Amino acid sequence: MTTRRQSDGAIVVDVRGTLDAATVDALREALLSTLHAERPVSMIVDLTFVTFMDSMGIGALVTGYNAARETGTRFVLRNPSEFVHRQLRVTGLTEMFGLSQTAGSAQPHTP
């Protein structure tokens, strides 16, 4: 996982591999510490290369979303893989994250 700032000031968190009990603490910490330290206008979580996500991964994304709302940061999930999109759809979270009901059309969500 890497974090970088775009020229427009948005923070991008690139996540790769699996989001499960073994890896989710690092994501949660990256999201929360970056939100509180940087207070970016937008945080983009790029999920292009996430191959698996369980309920712990979903929980970390929800935690990040809620923390972003508290700081007035726009929280965007970018390019969720078909598997990740399906997990979010099954749990009823696509609307909360501003995603369409079909994979491949992520929309930014403004809290």
How would you name each of these model-derived features?
Residues M1-T51, T63-P111:
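STAS-like cytosolic regulatory interaction modules
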Residues D54:
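Conserved G/P- and acidic residue-centered "switch" motifs that form tight phosphate/ATP-binding loops
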